[in-house]
């Protein structure tokens, strides 16, 4: 029993290694490992029972003992193992598809005046003629006459013509920075102002935000109304009704006890759990932990 590297084995079967005279010797092998197995010399193509053609390729033998695989239409490669990449010619503008049979890949040989992977662009395209992208920018052809520049770090603009003034992050408080003609411009979030959006707007300077006698409290980028008793809402614009909506949690029922007061009637299980927590806290307070303090 012989074994070839890569799992090949058996006389005449598929195996590791390639049909090369410099194939490496393998342990437990009677000679060298070839594509067809282990033998003292390489098998002859389309002879010695070695017919490697796939995809209905036909083995053809020459008088000198060599052979090759004759591939059906749509396949190529040494063993017809690749689909013909030129079967559907992608080359445009009179370009010629050139297949690389061994790799199963193809390239386009473009007609004069055209370029691109598929010969889709004219050499009169601005990317070639005027080289519009400045400061090391890369020109990408979008169509026959349009392009887009990818700029190097530190530059911006349609043609990378401006120094990116936003690179130093000058805009504060979550504002958006844009560069126009080498200058930055900050678009501030609501509640902030200034060239760099560094100044908080004091909304409380403008009267009327809080209704029914509510007090305005300025906050960074916003404000809050502190309502008088009997009123609620963002602007103190709603009458306060203690149980609408109910403030009670865990299934408790709200009962209004006065104009501005209420009480929660809790479910028995909730009361029991609350009592257990209270008893545990009391034991901790009266026990060892309290004595150590």
UniProtKB/Swiss-Prot annotation:
Chain ranges passing through the membrane: none
Chief place of localization: secreted
SUPFAM superfamilies assigned to the protein according to its UniProt record, in alphabetical order: EGF/Laminin
Pfam families assigned to the protein according to its UniProt record, in alphabetical order: EGF, EGF_CA
Tissue distribution: Expressed in radial glia neural stem cells during cortical development.
Superkingdom field: Eukaryota
Keywords carried by this UniProt record: Calcium, Disulfide bond, EGF-like domain, Glycoprotein, Neurodegeneration, Notch signaling pathway, Repeat, Secreted
Record-annotated disulphide pairs: 46-59, 53-69, 71-80, 86-97, 91-108, 110-119, 127-139, 133-149, 151-160, 166-177, 171-186, 188-197, 204-216, 210-225, 227-236, 243-254, 248-264
CDD domains assigned: EGF_CA
Domain EGF-like: 42-81, 82-120, 123-161, 162-198, 200-237, 239-276
SMART domains for this protein: EGF, EGF_CA
Membrane found in the keyword field: no
Cellular component terms (Gene Ontology): extracellular region
Cited InterPro entries: EGF-like_Ca-bd_dom, EGF-like_dom, EGF-type_Asp/Asn_hydroxyl_site, EGF_Ca-bd_CS, NOTCH1_EGF-like
Localization of this protein: Secreted
Gene Ontology MF terms: calcium ion binding
Associated pathology: Neuronal intranuclear inclusion disease: An autosomal dominant, slowly progressive, neurodegenerative disease characterized by eosinophilic hyaline intranuclear inclusions in the central and peripheral nervous system, and also in the visceral organs. Clinical manifestations are variable and include pyramidal and extrapyramidal symptoms, cerebellar ataxia, cognitive decline and dementia, peripheral neuropathy, and autonomic dysfunction.
Function recorded in the entry: Human-specific protein that promotes neural progenitor proliferation and evolutionary expansion of the brain neocortex by regulating the Notch signaling pathway. Able to promote neural progenitor self-renewal, possibly by down-regulating neuronal differentiation genes, thereby delaying the differentiation of neuronal progenitors and leading to an overall final increase in neuronal production. Acts by enhancing the Notch signaling pathway via two different mechanisms that probably work in parallel to reach the same effect.
Subunit note: Interacts with NOTCH2. Interacts with DLL1; the interaction is direct.
Family indicated by similarity: Belongs to the NOTCH family.
Further information: NOTCH2NLA, NOTCH2NLB and NOTCH2NLC paralogs arose between 4 and 3 million years ago, after the separation of hominids from the chimpanzee and during the early stages of the expansion of the human cortex.
Protein name: Notch homolog 2 N-terminal-like protein C
Provenance organism: Homo sapiens
Gene assigned in the entry: NOTCH2NLC
